[in-house]
Amino acid sequence: FRKAAFPQGKRRLDRFIPVSRVADMLLQPGATIPFNGQNVTLPEIDLVWWAGGNPFHHHQDLHRLSNAFRKPATVIVNDSFFQPTCRLADIVLPATTFLERNDWAASAHGGAITPMHQLAEPFAKARNDHDIFAAMAERFGLREAFTEERDEMGWIRHMWGITRDNARRGGYDLPEFGTFWT
């Protein structure tokens, strides 16, 4: 059965950049590259906001990627640790670790689903990604559209409900949220 995923919102553009071509995009705006049987024209990017992961962990040419991250006017990074992308950022927004927030984890191809209870208060001014993006959305007058009027626990409950419904349709019986969360 399919586990819940956060809504990605409506794409206002019909183009995308393969993550493996981020350096090309930043270093060669306007260039055309082949991708998946199509030609993709790389846009000019003035701002990069990187949250969730570290591109330096999986890029083929770290020196080239490092040079690429120096090109945009502004680089913002949300992260729990001061990793290489943070060193190249103009703004680093400290994000909570999995120990400092409530969450739940599920294996993509197996049956494992586990609650992840917050074990410690966030260090210094760290905030979870949801709160960081909700604060930014608020500055643009879009908080309600972004949060759908849910906080961290509201989203956890909502995502559990979707997953539980999907499981039921697949012939599996998952417990009510209260039982799962305890």
Feature locations, PLM:
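N-terminal leader/propeptide and maturation segments of large enzyme subunits in energy/redox metabolism
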Residues: 1-12, 119-182
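Extended redox/cofactor-interaction regions of prokaryotic respiratory oxidoreductases
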Residues: 1-87, 97-104, 170-182
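Generic structural signal for well-ordered, non-membrane alpha-helical segments
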Residues: 41, 62, 113, 125-133
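Catalytic, metal-anchored helix/loop core of enzyme active sites in primary metabolism
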Residues: 90
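Flexible, acidic/glycine-enriched loop-and-adjacent beta/alpha segments
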Residues: 93
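Short beta-alpha connecting loops at secondary-structure transitions
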Residues: 96, 111-122
